[in-house]
């Protein structure tokens, strides 16, 4: 198993190299050269196993034998030992065929913990083995930053720099990034939106001299290992609901397309998924793209679901690569058009392939608030705004007799203002985070300029020691 770039002009890499590299040197994203395959019999054999045991079985083929089995098992056990629910990703039934998969039982109350806790341990292992250090950079629309900082805080071989849009994340999300006391953690409040933050991260990776000098590595879902870790909960959920002997549908609130692309990966690996439904807020570029066949950027609107206030969905490039039968030249042309003119057309055959696997829908701000209120009134279940988008769209895409699972991506207490406004309920933070809002903050406000960000990182990163070979 090795990994190839969606743009076809970077070298193929083994697992640990792809892990530490993040973004390919041609600007593309790494994907497995070949999808592992699981038979129905193998999927049935997962029944009755713990989340950790299933994770080991599903993820092992991706590691290419580069990590000893016992070491990999221990990493998985340690990563998910940080979760507050024994099932890691438990299911809650909200209707006859409707389920919510709760992905917020990790340390920062968001689905990003599922991948980030494992990613930190994988990176530690790879860096330790090589005697290297790394400078971790990440852009966040809210949840990635807190999850990454929690996972990497205090780790000796990494410095972490998280860029978030100043004034555009929830107060809880901001405190989870700005109250760490670890010396290796740096939170940068960028005077712009999430797309500005993401563009700065990509620009740093494309600045080869800077990238090599500070030993740059990434934790956004441009990093294949993030997607890989998220594949697991599609398998655990499907098996719990009778898979592979019945098909399951999933609705995923998404902006950057990473979480739902993990579902696509699971389907490619043999999991019998019926529908993968993209749920967007008013920043609906993914819904528009499926409808029109044209990917066109618009201005970002601020909503009550800030983690989805995105117009450039990085992981859509991975799906394009698959839809174009892995023709990297067509992906390069699309990405160049996006860069030059803010959009691109998807060829009819590729669009047909995408529509075969995906459906899409959007929820307005009014519909989000109404879904939070209605769900709580009818079932007693409290949703955060992102999960409410999923529930609203799922209700319109359900099929009789096919279970529909909505991924709940964050705890409602991360968005108390929106939740209280919609439901009248003031969601409390769990006891272990009760003092979060009283902690002292530490962050740097910075302009959305590459030079300013690189200068700050260059002054604070320790990654250029023990430089080693280029990645």
Which residues does each PLM region occupy?
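PLP-dependent amino-acid enzyme catalytic core
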Residues: 1-471
């Amino acid at each position: 198993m090795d990994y190839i770039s969606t743009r076809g002009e970077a070298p193929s890499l083994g697992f640990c190299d792809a892990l530490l590299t993040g973004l390919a040197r041609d600007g593309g994203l790494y994907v497995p050269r070949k999808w592992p395959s699981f038979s129905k019999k193998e999927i049935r054999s997962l029944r009755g196993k713990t989340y950790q045991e299933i994770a080991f079985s599903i993820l092992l083929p991706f590691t290419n034998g580069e990590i000893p089995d016992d070491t990999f098992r221990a990493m998985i056990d340690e990563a998910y030992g940080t979760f507050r629910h024994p099932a890691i990703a438990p299911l809650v039934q909200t209707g006859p065929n409707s389920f919510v998969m709760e992905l917020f039982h990790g340390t920062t109350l968001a689905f990003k913990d599922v991948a980030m806790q494992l990613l930190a341990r994988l990176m530690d292992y790879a860096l330790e083995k090589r005697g290297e250090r790394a400078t971790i950079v990440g852009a966040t629309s809210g949840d990635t930053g807190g999850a990454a900082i929690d996972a990497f805080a205090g780790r000796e071989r990494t410095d972490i720099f998280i860029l978030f849009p100043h004034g555009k994340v929830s107060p809880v999300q901001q405190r989870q990034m700005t109250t760490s006391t670890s010396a290796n953690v740096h939170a940068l409040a960028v005077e712009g939106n999430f797309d500005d933050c993401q563009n700065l991260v990509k620009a740093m990776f494309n600045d080869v001299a800077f990238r090599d000098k500070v030993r740059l590595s990434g934790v956004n879902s441009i990093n294949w290992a993030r997607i890989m870790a998220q594949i697991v909960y599609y398998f655990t959920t499907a098996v719990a609901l009778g898979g592979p002997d019945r098909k399951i549908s999933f609705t995923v609130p998404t902006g950057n397309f990473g979480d739902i692309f993990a579902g696509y990966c699971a389907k490619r690996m043999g999991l019998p998924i019926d529908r993968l439904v993209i749920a967007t807020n008013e920043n609906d570029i993914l819904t528009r793209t499926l409808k029109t066949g044209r990917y066109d950027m618009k201005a970002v609107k601020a909503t009550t679901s800030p983690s989805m206030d995105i117009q450039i969905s990085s992981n859509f490039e991975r799906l394009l690569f698959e839809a174009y039968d892995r023709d990297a030249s067509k992906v390069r042309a699309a990405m160049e058009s996006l860069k030059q003119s803010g959009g691109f057309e998807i060829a009819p055959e590729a669009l047909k392939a995408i529509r075969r696997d995906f459906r899409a829908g959007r929820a307005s701000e009014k519909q989000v608030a109404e879904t939070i209120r209605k769900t709580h009134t009818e079932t007693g279940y409290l949703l955060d705004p992102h999960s409410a988008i999923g529930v609203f769209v799922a209700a319109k895409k359900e099929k009789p007799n096919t279970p529909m699972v909505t991924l709940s991506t964050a705890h409602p207490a991360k968005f108390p203002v929106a939740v209280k406004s919609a439901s009248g309920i003031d969601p409390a933070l769990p006891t272990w985070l009760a003092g979060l809002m009283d902690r002292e903050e530490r962050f740097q406000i910075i302009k959305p300029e590459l030079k300013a960000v690189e200068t700050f990182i260059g002054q604070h990163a320790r990654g250029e020691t023990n430089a080693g070979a280029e990645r």
